[in-house]
Amino acid sequence: MKSILENRPALAKEVNKVAEVAGYLWQKGWAERNGGNITVNITEFVDDEIRRMEPISEVKSIGVTLPYLKGCYFYCKGTNKRMRDLARWPMENGSVIRILDDCASYVIIADEAVAPTSELPSHLSVHNDLLSKNSPYKASVHTHPIELIAMTHCEKFLQKDVATNLLWSMIPETKAFCPRGLGIIPYKLPSSVELAEATIKELQDYDVVMWEKHGVFAVDCDAMQAFDQIDVLNKSALIYIAAKNMGFEPDGMSQEQMKEMSVAFNLPK
């Protein structure tokens, strides 16, 4: 059977972005074993032939009703699949799903019946919220950046915007390319409804949120842009740690310098 990506260059390009990001996550050491997830709303790339495709799985319950996702299509990383494998074989380690009209269930339509991530309800709940606000964001990326996670083991960095201001101050690019900062979510059980609800709430003010002692969750227009936000934040964490390892507390950019950037580049914060 031919791949859903065949003769669909726009869709193939979007899935290949996911594969490229998956490779970066593995190379950086942020995706141990099957760690991390990527879910992308690909509805805009769906044609009539895809809409007529028969499911290759039974109907599966999402576990929650998501009214804004009716008729939407997503590419999802598979459960227990490794990012390093997805980077090479995206359609063997992920699948395309169709949300059914009840907005509470889905079927897999391509290429193989790869069950989506166990965190699918959380990811889809975020996408439902994004659509409810007419957000242009189509991708959600969850990964385990080492240095950012390390910072959450220190109580002071769990206070609102303490980590944001520190990370912004390390290098101008972080302020410029992650302009809404880093939200903080106190530890909650992985894959829980409570974690999903807290994530949606925190994403009202941030594009990237930190799950204490767990990882990062980011949203953006595509998987690459979501990755970029995480990448610049972790670069700042590395600069901070490098300075501490040299035996000094880094000065960082001043509040006045960061405010100057916000005005000059019309940043939201």
Swiss-Prot record:
Residue numbers annotated as active site: E119
Cofactor(s) listed: Zn(2+)
Protein's cellular compartments: Cytoplasm
Biological process annotations from GO: pentose catabolic process; rhamnose catabolic process
Cystine bridges: none
Protein's job: Catalyzes the reversible cleavage of L-rhamnulose-1-phosphate to dihydroxyacetone phosphate (DHAP) and L-lactaldehyde.
Full protein name: Rhamnulose-1-phosphate aldolase
Species annotation: Bacteroides thetaiotaomicron (strain ATCC 29148 / DSM 2079 / JCM 5827 / CCUG 10774 / NCTC 10582 / VPI-5482 / E50)
